């Protein structure tokens, strides 16, 4: 806030937030970002699609707005003591950049598994980095402890009125750039951006609908709305890490509950497809959470048959790990419903694959994985190009069933898409008493060694597959030879502390890998 104004606190009303947004001095650090028409997508979806380019900020995300708004309102005494926060991503860079502009010392606590590119970016903006903890929660606990011990001011990533007001400046720009919008789609992690955008728009132009978009595997706002209060998610997804928040903020929830018009969730494949749309239309390379709002917009348009409207979405960030783009490229066809993945049983005789392809009626086969395992039947993993999306996929399934083939649709099977497709043909030569688990490993030195020391010396590992996706965590698929009752194994899993899920009954595993 300006020197002659009082920072917000408590639970301000909408009018108070409006005044705070108007007074927020964010442009001492942030920029007015363009609102750009997506020509190709507008034509394809029969709506005017506009993108708010927050990737053009100095830190390549909207987080700078909220961080600077709060830090600029600190007292001289608070500034002298410095600030502290915990983050593995965009908020860390926003705080570091703001601290340099304000001449305030900033300590950013980041999990030890944080990618070097993110650590280097924070240091490049002038922030001091402390690597601590295996995850965000441990890093946050350390930051709060240091705040209390050394007098730092804690700068939260979303749940503070001044942070929310700072994010609300984006909405003010949006209305100044186009006052004829019908709907605005906003990504949600902790809710700071959604709260700020919604409260501002509803004060000035309440006829504009504000729709929140969440990742299906990190939908903390939806869970809170369903429960009537903020709740903890048992786990969050890793792909859209910028919105991977287990619990919505208290103040952000209060505002979202009051001012949002609707909410929609999308899966990772839809996010990948939206990232492709942004690149092809405006040559923006968004991070997954940055493309989240567009993914939700596309799904919302399809669900509600929207035509002829002016729709804006927020490209919230572009701090993407380059190595993660391989994963995006692989998955965007599925997200656009342009590919079907199928497990099909065909006779193990010459010409059977030719007959199968002929039945597909000239459709392109995008992927075919097979290895001889049985003299009578072959299980194949096949990808088929689609031109008419889900409707065509259903037609293919029906056609194959009518043709006498046993077929399982794996297009929505996460394990099949992530790992099994690269392992087809690895059946053991004899039956095994094995159980299959998927794990999320931190991408840090010693993670694999810890896994093997905890589990690999006590039980035989009969299958193992790891693949990096360019995020702070990797995905591992591992099978263990276990007896009928192995209580010690469950104990060891808990000791390991990695997020894991039993995948033994997964159809892709049964088709292609199980003994």
Regions found by a protein language model. Name each.
Residues 1-447, 451-515:
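PLP-dependent amino-acid enzyme catalytic core
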């Amino acid at each position: 806030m300006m020197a002659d104004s009082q920072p917000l606190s408590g639970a301000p009303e909408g009018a108070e937030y409006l005044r705070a947004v108007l007074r927020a001095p964010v442009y001492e650090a942030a920029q007015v970002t363009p609102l750009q028409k997506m020509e190709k997508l507008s034509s394809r979806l029969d709506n005017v699609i506009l993108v708010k380019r927050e990737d053009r900020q100095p830190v390549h995300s909207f987080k700078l707005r909220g961080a600077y708004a709060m830090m600029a309102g600190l007292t001289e005494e608070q500034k002298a003591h410095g600030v502290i926060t915990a983050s593995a991503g965009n908020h860390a860079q926003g705080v570091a950049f703001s601290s340099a502009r304000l001449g305030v010392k900033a300590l950013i606590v980041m999990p030890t598994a944080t990618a070097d590119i993110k650590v280097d970016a924070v240091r490049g903006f002038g922030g001091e980095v402390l690597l601590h903890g295996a995850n965000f929660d441990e890093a946050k606990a350390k930051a709060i402890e240091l705040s209390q011990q050394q007098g730092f001011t804690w700068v939260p990533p979303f749940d503070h009125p001044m942070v929310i007001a700072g994010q609300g400046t984006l909405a003010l720009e949006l209305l100044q750039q186009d006052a004829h919008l019908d709907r605005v789609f906003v990504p949600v992690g902790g809710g700071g951006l959604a709260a700020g955008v919604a409260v501002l728009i509803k004060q000035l132009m309440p006829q504009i609908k504000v729709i929140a978009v969440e990742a299906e595997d990190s939908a903390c706002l939806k869970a809170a709305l369903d429960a009537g209060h903020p709740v903890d998610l048992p786990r969050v997804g890793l792909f859209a890490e910028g919105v991977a928040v287990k619990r919505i903020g208290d103040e952000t929830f209060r505002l979202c509950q009051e001012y949002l018009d609707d909410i929609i969730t999308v899966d990772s494949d839809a996010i990948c497809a939206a990232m492709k749309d942004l690149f092809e239309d405006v040559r923006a390379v968004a991070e997954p959470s940055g493309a989240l709002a567009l993914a939700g917009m596309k799904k919302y348009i399809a669900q509600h048959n929207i035509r002829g409207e002016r729709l804006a979405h927020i490209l919230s960030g572009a701090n993407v790990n380059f190595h993660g783009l391989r994963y995006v490229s692989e998955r965007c066809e599925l997200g656009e419903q342009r590919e079907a993945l199928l497990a099909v049983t065909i006779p193990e005789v010459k010409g059977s694959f030719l007959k199968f392809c002929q039945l597909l009626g000239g459709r392109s086969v995008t992927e075919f994985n097979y290895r001889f395992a049985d003299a009578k039947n072959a299980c194949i993993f096949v990808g088929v190009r689609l031109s008419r999306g889900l409707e065509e996929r259903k037609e293919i399934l029906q056609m194959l069933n009518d043709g006498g083939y046993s077929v399982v649709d794996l297009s929505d099977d996460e394990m099949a898409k992530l790992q099994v497709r690269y392992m087809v043909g690895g059946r053991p030569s004899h039956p095994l008493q094995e159980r299959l688990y998927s794990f999320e490993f931190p991408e840090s030195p010693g993670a694999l060694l810890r896994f093997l020391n905890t589990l690999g010396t006590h039980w035989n590992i009969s299958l193992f597959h790891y693949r990096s996706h360019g995020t702070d965590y990797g995905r591992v698929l591992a099978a263990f030879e276990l007896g009928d009752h192995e209580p010690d194994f469950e104990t060891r899993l808990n000791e390991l502390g990695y997020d894991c899920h039993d995948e033994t009954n997964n159809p892709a595993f049964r088709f292609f890998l199980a003994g």
